[in-house]
Curated annotation (Swiss-Prot):
The active site is at 329 (nucleophile), 431. PROSITE patterns: GATASE_COBBQ. Keywords: Cobalamin biosynthesis, Glutamine amidotransferase. Pathway: Cofactor biosynthesis; adenosylcobalamin biosynthesis. Belongs to the CobB/CobQ family. CobQ subfamily. Pfam families: CbiA, GATase_3. This is Cobyric acid synthase. Catalyzes amidations at positions B, D, E, and G on adenosylcobyrinic A,C-diamide. NH(2) groups are provided by glutamine, and one molecule of ATP is hydrogenolyzed for each amidation. Residues 248-439 form the GATase cobBQ-type domain. GO terms for molecular function: ABC-type vitamin B12 transporter activity; catalytic activity.
Length: 486
């Protein structure tokens, strides 16, 4: 089990790389995360929903993403509450106190999934969540040492040296653990190191002498990996390329408080002809060719935030001067006349006025749509698209008579989304639009980039997984690691 001294220490990436190394060796391997809290998710082969990081790890392992890989997923809907997803299905919304009381039930689901994986795979790389040293969460912990103790799983601690204080992180975390938990820790991995590793050796020697546990490797800072993020936005909000493209398309995504599935935009960030930028609250929206309203886990709340920022006026001006707008999932719902939440699915019951630019309305429902889809964009050339739907809501109205996509095969195609009468606005429930090369190029051409190149985002991701695995093979003491974890 890979546990971290902090969130974003590199647990997800390390598990992905280790899964790829095991796959190379011919080992039947699976990733596993008992509990994840994330708004980036993926649809599984069994029709459920798991954290995006576990879907990436499944790709690394060469297996289909299944709900057993992440049996408990928490999707925050507010600062104090989250939607609780068990074995891929939304069960309820709970606040933090109520979920703490529910944890024994959730843990049963965790152990059921783990037992099934044990029966099917030779090796399982387990990923912890946050830090095992959160004293206030130790009671009823199911994500870190609580799980490791229950199934007798060895643990490796990883820390991010790029943040500073790596030795304090490791020794401090260890000191916060019980004696039995400390004995479960087999060693340390130091992640994201820059510079001459020989200068780090005195610190490594001190750490090993202090704790009696080995340093299993120092992993360098890897720039330019194209891998799906678990939840956090990338630290570099702007991705501009200097490859000499004659025409760059400027794309902006406003960062809403409950933004979800921002992995939709990874392919755009990697595109050599796209100048991409996330814009946070309090920041002016720069001039752009295309503004994309992303998915949201709280559409009424994010609509209110959008208006409070004055972004509705910015979008209106953008359209008035000929700009293009795409709304994806929650963003699509915002573009309509209203969003009704009669059951309080995403907050207090009520109805919120939409932006009103497309003639349809949405009612949020208790049932969630979860499915992988294929089809064709309603753009020149009808390019193929493959993606997925994750939403709680039904949308109806005349604007849907001019759909943005047709999903399914030609004999049983059904419409999705809408394109405005003036052709400036495109709305869809489908995530992953830009991952398909032809669809991405067609959407960029629609937005004004007539000579858009096709880039193969899945191939870029695969190359990054291979590079990650090569790096781990070089910088981890794999014989010592595998001996330590048994």
């Amino acid at each position: 089990m890979i546990q971290g001294t902090t969130s974003d220490a590199g647990k997800s990436t390390l598990v992905a790389g280790l899964c790829r190394l095991a796959r190379r060796a011919g080992v039947r391997v699976a990733p596993f995360k008992p509990q994840n809290m994330a708004l980036n998710s993926a649809v599984t082969v069994d029709g459920g929903e798991i954290g995006r990081a576990q879907a990436l790890q499944a790709i690394a392992a060469g297996i289909a993403a299944h709900t057993d890989l992440n049996p408990v997923l928490l999707k925050p809907t507010s600062d104090r509450g989250a939607q609780v997803i068990i074995h891929g299905k939304a069960r309820m919304n709970l606040d933090a106190r109520a979920y703490h009381d529910y944890k024994p039930v959730a843990f049963e689901a965790v152990l059921e999934s783990y037992a099934r994986l044990q029966a099917a795979y030779e090796t399982i790389f387990v990923e912890g969540a946050g830090s095992p040293a959160e004293i206030n969460l130790r009671d009823r912990d199911i994500a870190n040492m609580g799980f490791a103790e229950a199934v007798d799983c060895p643990v490796v601690l990883v820390a991010d040296i790029d943040r500073g204080g790596v030795f304090a992180h490791l020794t401090g975390t260890l000191a916060c653990l019980s004696a039995s938990e400390q004995s479960r820790v087999r060693g340390f991995i130091i992640n994201r190191f820059r510079g001459d590793v020989s200068l780090l050796k005195p610190g490594l020697d001190w750490l090993e002498a202090k704790t009696g546990k080995p340093v299993l490797g120092v992993v360098p800072y890897l720039h330019g990996l194209t891998l799906d993020a678990e939840d956090m936005l990338p630290p570099e909000l702007r991705a501009a390329h200097d490859g000499g493209a004659a025409r760059m398309l400027r794309v902006v995504v406003p960062v809403l408080p409950h933004i979800s599935n921002h992995t939709d935009f990874d392919a755009l960030r990697a595109h050599p002809q796209v100048d991409f930028e996330y814009v946070r609250s309090g920041t002016p929206v720069p001039p752009a060719d295309l503004i994309i309203l992303p998915g949201s886990k709280n559409v009424p709340g994010d609509l209110a935030s959008l208006r409070a920022q004055g972004w509705d006026a910015v979008l209106q001006k953008h359209l008035r001067y000929g700009g293009r707008v795409i709304g994806i999932c929650g963003g699509m719902q915002m573009l309509g006349r209203e969003v009704a939440d009669p059951h309080g699915v995403e907050g207090a019951p009520g109805t919120s006025a939409g932006l009103g630019w497309l003639d349809y309305s949405t009612v949020l429902t208790r049932d969630k749509t979860l499915k992988n889809v294929t089809g064709h964009l309603a753009l020149p050339g009808s390019p193929e698209v493959a993606g997925y739907e994750i939403h709680m809501g039904e949308t109806h109205g005349p604007a849907l008579d001019t759909p943005a996509l047709r999903l399914g095969d030609a004999q049983a195609a059904h419409p999705d989304g809408a394109i405005s009468a003036d052709g400036q606005i495109l709305a869809t429930y489908v995530h992953g639009l830009f991952d398909t090369p032809a669809a991405c190029a067609a959407l960029l051409a629609w937005a004004g980039l007539s000579d858009a190149e096709e880039i193969d985002y899945p191939a870029l991701r695969e190359a990054s997984l291979e590079r990650l695995a090569d790096t781990l093979a070089e910088h981890l003491d794999l014989p010592k690691l595998f001996a330590a974890i048994g």
